Amino acid sequence: HPRPYVDRVNFNGTTLNMNGLKQTLNIKKVPGYENFDWGDGEAPDNEYDGLYNSGSFPSGHTTKTYNRGLGLATLLPELGPELVARAAEGGNNRVVLGVHYPMDVIGGRIPASASVTALWSDATFRQNVLLPAHDELENYIAARCKADGNGDTVAACVSKTGANDKNGYKNTFTDAVSTEPVTDRASAIDAYTARMTYGFSQTSAAGQAPVVPQGAENLLLTAFPHLTDAQRRQVLEASEIDSGYPLDASSNGFERINLAKAFSAKVTLSEDGSTITAISFGAKAPTVVKTASSKDTITGLLTDFNKYYVAGKGVTDEGKSVLAHDDQLT
């Protein structure tokens, strides 16, 4: 498919068959802003005109910006929503420049998500490269934060400086898709979510069961290290947008998972930690809490007392063992 600014009526001396689509969108290519010497022996130029003959789908620059943005978010999950929203902005810039269509950008995000997932799912690469990189980055930032009096950890620093709120990533740009400026975490998540579909209508069945790509749970390993793989997959399931949007059917779930939301999840576990009882999004940090015990203090004391003493029978064997141990200590 040709670039948006291509003259489809007179492209290299021919008229392109657009199968009923508009012959021109009246989009003008932004002029190159510099003549760069690429060191290839040719006269310096921006080589922008070479895009005329290249296809539009998918956007390779979008794949790169999401690849870097999603990758960095896994290394610094405390700012995950902001980093992936910034990646979405990079993809959107390709539309603003008039060199790609929104569908190209969606098509660029999907393989980037898949490639970062593949890296985190490679146990050797994860152990030898990604986790050490995560630790090095966290330790460096924590040391700088401590030196500046902003706490001893990245989480404390992010909270104190407000980098996960109104003092963090901002962008005043708005358009027909992302209608509100990014001013805090909530609006960053909204911008990312809007750019997942670009306002397209659903082209296949809505309301289908969630689909989480194999290994995608590893994207949340640093954000939720104490959850199981299955529980991290549940977080991704809960983050997903609805089914049926363009490219969903062929994406194996990568079109749907919303990593801006997932990195802001508050996960509530059962008292024993085995079951997720609730998931909400928009938290200032990746958070895991446990359901409070249903037993009140008096009930708990009575339960413990009955383990050691039974009315009509006296001290139990377990109680005698405790008393004997107490005698040894005293």
Listing of model-derived features with the role each one plays in the protein:
Residues 148-180, 184:
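Extended ligand-binding clefts on enzyme/binding-domain cores
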Residues 99-162:
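Extended amphipathic alpha-helical segments with heptad-repeat/coiled-coil character used for oligomerization
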